[in-house]
Amino acid sequence: MDIEKILQQMTPEEKADFCSGSDFWHTQPVERLGVPAVMMSDGPSGLRKQDEQGDHLGINESIPAVCFPSSAAVASSFDTALAEKLGETLGNECRAENLALLLGPGLNIKRSPLCGRNFEYFSEDPYLSGEMGAALVNGIQSNGVGSCIKHFAANNQETDRMVSDSVMDERTLHEIYLPAFETVVKKAKPLGVMAAYNKLNGTHCSENKELLTDILRKRWGYEGMVVTDWGAVKDRAKGIAAGQDLEMPGGSGRGTNSILSAIKAGTLSEEELNAAVRNLLRFVDSVTKTENASAVFDRDADYRMAVSVAENSAVLLKNEKGVLPLAKGCKAVFLGEFAQHPRYQGGGSSHVNSAKVSCALEHAPGVAYAQGYRTDEDTVDPALEQAAVAAAVDADVAVIFAGLPERYESEGYDRTTLAMPENQNHLIAAVAAVQPNTVVVLHNGSAIEMPWVNDVPAVLELYLAGDGAGEAAVNLLYGAVNPSGKLAETFPRRLSDTPAYLSFPGERETSVYSEGVFVGYRYYDTTEADVLFPFGHGLSYTTFEYSVLRLSRSTVREGEEVQVTVTVKNTGAVAGKETVQLYVAPPKGERHRPVRELKGFAKVSLQPGESKEVQFTLDKRSLAYYEPELHDFYAESGTYQICVGASSRDLRLTGLLEWQAAQPLPVHFTAASTLKQVMTHPVGAAIIGPILQRMAAAAGLSLIHISEATRHSLISY
């Protein structure tokens, strides 16, 4: 496709029309110039291709497809190779269904566990979100189709999402809410970026030039197209000028008229319109180069992939007394409606019309079952509960399948509590009171409270595990698969412990991010708060030993890297996988920083007795924070701790790294600056120190005698 030639031949009306979709899922064709329409579809956990009337909330039916584990589950695998393989599967499905663009993954940070859409997002940590997102996008796009990362940016709640203003300081934005997008843009080059519904610091994301042009294109070098979230356009011409290319859905003609009127009025230039059209033509050209005829949507094979991802993502939160894995021949009873009808996916635009869903009961023949509770209500049903308790008494082990019904969490609204339904909590407590070998298997999209956690010996977190949820659960429970997932989010003990408790979801359509950079484990670990389960936590049916931490150099300067290696050994009796996590703890400096941050991870598979060496590479960005004075990332000189372990609170080995910055952080002294502030800065001390020495000598004093003066500002002297 000769893009510049086509651009020259297009009329202003065709250009304006081209910048809006032709309907709910297709771009606008320019038939006389040979530009075809291409189709896009949700979503991040499986195809939601709609042949009937389109919608963005999963109301109307879509083609039968495979539902894969949600992003919350996939992130818990801490396995980028697995994420890339999943992406390849999704990309192949897109080709087979003649889809040009898959709308996902979502890269928004889990600011609060209450966000109703958290199941669609990877993590509370931007580094993990970026690495997993880049792997998934690379896999999707390896098939010649596009991936559209979303929702750019700071779309961290469903409450008032169309109008809410996410208000935060520059450092918080660049350090927490943008890095995942930056990583994916630079490492995977997604063909699409979706502008979010919400405002960011007073300006709608779909018309935010700082976000869409200054940061995305100029700073990060993005060359793809920007599409609005469905119905996110407020002012079409402002959006084009800001760097937003495609309005979705289309078909009304309002966008075309708005653009043409703005050009006529001089508020939108032809160059700005041409830039948007050029981006869209490049996108269409890119996704129409690959022949789709050879691609086959093998639903059976893809179901096996869904099972594998679920098995590798499940997190064993607790396992006392060796209750798990279940012994062969033990008399087990499965309790809870989720054992028969699992909660395997989230609601809203990610909803997949599953061709096949497995339940735990069908994969555990001969196991007794009692319903225990109903998912369509929260109140205790005495008859159902009593029958379940009686069945538990008669068994060697009781396995309770519990979690959150779909009505508790979905796109479109946020949760108001971390509690599970009353009837489920009551059932778990009642069963645990009579059966010491009680296992809880959880189906939920985000963190929950567990008032019964001290009363049960084992808890297995599946999240929303897709079509293979039931089969994966049984394989994990009986030890056919060894759990290897790690939590990609902290599980707090109670809602009031969460860092955004006082400001989420905000008020009067404004959400102030008052917690700043202290999100998730950055807050909990810095404040040493008691949590239910920490970030990165996850057990195994075997044990692992960490040893021999080495740094390739002890001092690093600007432009240099350091390699960190550690040896991990499987010290148990069965094969297993361990995710080695690397955290960086900064020295005390000019800015308040989290006590430690994840800067590397690697998942290794080990046979009993086997050892492997794991290597990480750290650079300046690994040590840096975002400095508003510089409008860039900055790493202060000093000694950094390099910590390696099994979670953010299970750190096995620590090394020291000396970083030497190319230049000290600029500082501004004013008449209101204290002597302490001046004297603790090397430049200030060099200037003021000799003056104070002369003053002290003239008065017959030493500097110690005037140390009290450091409490006062310079204006006092």
Task: Show the residue positions of the predicted features.
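Terminal connector regions
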Residues: K620-Q663
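Residue-level detector of conserved catalytic or cofactor/ligand-binding positions
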Residues: I704-Y717
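Charged/polar low-complexity intrinsically disordered segments, enriched in acidic residues
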Residues: S673-L703, S707
